[in-house]
Amino acid sequence: MMEKAAARQAELAKPPGSLGRLEDISVKIAGITGELAPNVTRQAIAVMSADNGVWEEGVACAPQSVTRAQTINFTRRLTGVGALSKNFGVDLLVTDVGVLDPIPDELYTDRPEIAVGAAAECATGSVAAIGKAVVTEKGVPAGGKVAAGIGVLAGTGARAGIGARAGTGVQAGKIWNRKIRPATNNIYKEAAMTEEEALLAIETGFEAARTLKKLGYGMIGVGEMGIGNTTTSTCLLAEFTGVPAAQIVGKGGGLSSDGYERKKAVVSGACERAESELGDRREDPIAVLAELGGFDIAAMAGAYIGAAACRLPVVIDGYISVVAALTADRIFDYYRVTSDVAGQPGKPAGPAFRLADFMFASHKSFERGYEVAVEALGLEPMLLLGMRLGEGSGCPIAFKVIESAVAVMRDMATFEEAAINDDYLDEIRLGDSF
């Protein structure tokens, strides 16, 4: 389909390459969805909220209570992503995977969707069903993952009932209650979570993406809320890329000089502790995630994996979102299996591809480690707006760029349709004229 899309782009009535990255985006969208000009006008953002125990080390200027407050404010469209998504007609699926402070029971829902009608198709077996093996039905690594982990990445886990029916959208004003527990542990002193908890969070994100697909959304974004999560993100980024932690520590929501030095020390110390604990398991991304991540990041990673399983284009927001995307990419790559060693990490079978092939980077974050993460994914952000808010706030703007790319593919005439002789472009097409 990508070849067909590229061929049509070459036939559109314009100088070759004159629409720049819109042309590349339209071809990539066609490859993801299997449609030349899919309907991507219905969009939603999955926002994962959780607190981080490392906050107690003084790595953030904001109190932990902000996580709860903003999670509630998402439902009222009073946050940055709330206002932007409201303006662009984008829905929010707000999920509590580990908020510390109690949220009123009346705001919670066990089923985020309004369920009526027939379900859209979405992979329900292993991700291998779409040619992208992560973990097969038999594929629990020896001595490692819990049994539930088979279903987590395959979308068939014990809690995978959500989205069994399709509907008209997510419930407005509600928070999906998938709280694993109130906040992670302090990664400076101990592992953030158990691997079982990491898998539950990944499963939640997978289910979120699958639910949104079944509800008829044509494109999704991934956002977050969790005070202290630039610290956890930086630790994961350092481990996944090998870049020294001190070189990629940023100031997050803002820090004094003393606070910044403290944050660098905490990130470096947390990485040293985790590396000692992990030993030869440092190559296992789920083990690394459990040591240094957060419930929010784990759930976001699951959403990226779920989007790929459903052939659903997914947009990355800023720094935390791009590190979660890299986490998903590492998990996906590590757990690809060979046909002769089911369940064991090995050489990828089949054609070369990456989970990042399903992703779009929305905007360049000013957070220090962003460029390292996005380059590791092989992606290029669409927008340079000086943004560094998070929440998923870059996604609604990027959605419109992607919509525009699809509109060009769908509505623009070819030279033949426009009755224009394009012979004058022959020399330009052969040479380096731009």
Predicted feature locations:
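N-terminal loops that bind phosphate or other acidic moieties
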Residues: 1-151, 155, 161, 165-434
